[in-house]
Amino acid sequence: MGCFGYLLLIIGLHQVLATYPIWWSLAVGQQYSSLGTQPIPCGTIPGLVAKQMRFCRNYMEIMPSVAEGVKIGIQECQHQFRGRRWNCTTVNDNLAIFGPVLDKATRESAFVHAIASAGVAFAVTRSCAEGSATICGCDTHHKGPPGEGWKWGGCSEDMDFGSMVSREFADARENRPDARSAMNRHNNEAGRTSILDHRHLKCKCHGLSGSCEVKTCWWSQPDFRVIGDYLKDKYDSASEMVVEKHRESRGWVETLRPKYTFFKPPIERDLIYYESSPNFCEPNPETGSFGTRDRECNVTSHGIDGCDLLCCGRGQNTRTEKRKEKCHCIFHWCCYVSCQECMRVYDVHTCK
């Protein structure tokens, strides 16, 4: 990112950090990447509120999974938005890892909160099933009798425990009576719910000579790409809300209601937002936009990844690029494939 990345952090930093989940820096911090499955000292994690600090100390052995969950959430965000004007760019080695871009209550902020919350639930659940933590394990509450021709067996992944960890930790700082906290809580829960909604049975056959005399089944999480695809669809159809203020015994409270009453109101699985997104065409330190100059675009696409839209009408530059690829592959009996290496020339298009 260079100097511009640091400039993004400086502009409006005070406002950003007031509501920013700074603990997301666990996902990119150099000091945590080398720890592997070793416990993370709670005092070294920036931005924890008191409830998060207590949780960290009580469940220290699963904190590496929390960090891993945020990391896979960010990686999935970058995959889902790889062809869009905002591509989930992070500002490494800074507390506000996305810069000011998430300071606004936009669709992008809704997606990032949902995918990060889902990532934490996913990683903790996986860690428990793999036996990496002593405080959790397989789910023994199978939620229903077995079906015809199979019985419960194996290790059902305890998705309820993973969701609990995500809820207790990620939502701990979202306790303010304002609209942004309400939005973040809703989108965090939408992310967690997506995992439970996409769980599925995995089964294994047992018997002589490959027969399936006995079949054992267990609950399994979906592949995280399934969650990313699903939440990306929810991003595209996110519900716009408006902020309402009313007075309660504890003071002024902000709540959210749908902006358009003729649409179906959002449910817990939907993403919500209440501020418009910038167009992300040009660099803007105040909004956190890096612009799209020099971004690679698809000259044949009419979608958002196409040069017309991604480059915001500025046009594109074209250069040729040589790439080594495997070619003339031959299957040999038995059993391997040999290939030659060919040099091929491609046109690469980047935004002006």
Curated annotation (Swiss-Prot):
Family matches, as InterPro entries = Wnt (IPR005817), Wnt3 (IPR009141), Wnt_C (IPR043158), Wnt_CS (IPR018161)
Listed under GO cellular component are: extracellular space
Q: Where can this protein be found?
A: Secreted, Extracellular space, Extracellular matrix; Secreted
PROSITE patterns the record matches: WNT1
Q: Does the keyword GTP-binding apply?
A: no
**Signal sequence segment:** 1-18
Provide the glycosylation site positions.
Answer: 87, 298
Disulphide bridges, residue numbers:
77-88, 128-136, 138-155, 203-217, 205-212, 297-312, 327-342, 329-339, 334-335
Alphabetic keyword roster:
Developmental protein, Disulfide bond, Extracellular matrix, Glycoprotein, Lipoprotein, Secreted, Signal, Wnt signaling pathway
Give the tissue specificity. Answer: At neurula in anterior neural fold; at tailbud in dorsal midline of midbrain.
User: A GO molecular-function term, please?
Assistant: frizzled binding
Covalently lipidated residues, kind O-palmitoleoyl serine: 209
Transmembrane portions of the chain: none
Q: Tell me where on the tree of life, at the top rank, the source sits.
A: Eukaryota
Q: Does the keyword Secreted apply?
A: yes
Q: Name one GO biological process term.
A: cell fate commitment
Task: Reproduce the UniProt comment on modification after translation.
Answer: Disulfide bonds have critical and distinct roles in secretion and activity. Loss of each conserved cysteine results in high molecular weight oxidized Wnt oligomers, which are formed through inter-Wnt disulfide bonding. Palmitoleoylation is required for efficient binding to frizzled receptors. Depalmitoleoylation leads to Wnt signaling pathway inhibition.
Q: What does this protein do?
A: Ligand for members of the frizzled family of seven transmembrane receptors. Functions in the canonical Wnt signaling pathway that results in activation of transcription factors of the TCF/LEF family. Required for normal embryonic mesoderm development and formation of caudal somites. Required for normal morphogenesis of the developing neural tube.
Report the family membership: Belongs to the Wnt family.
Give the protein's recorded name. Protein Wnt-3a
Gene behind this protein: wnt3a
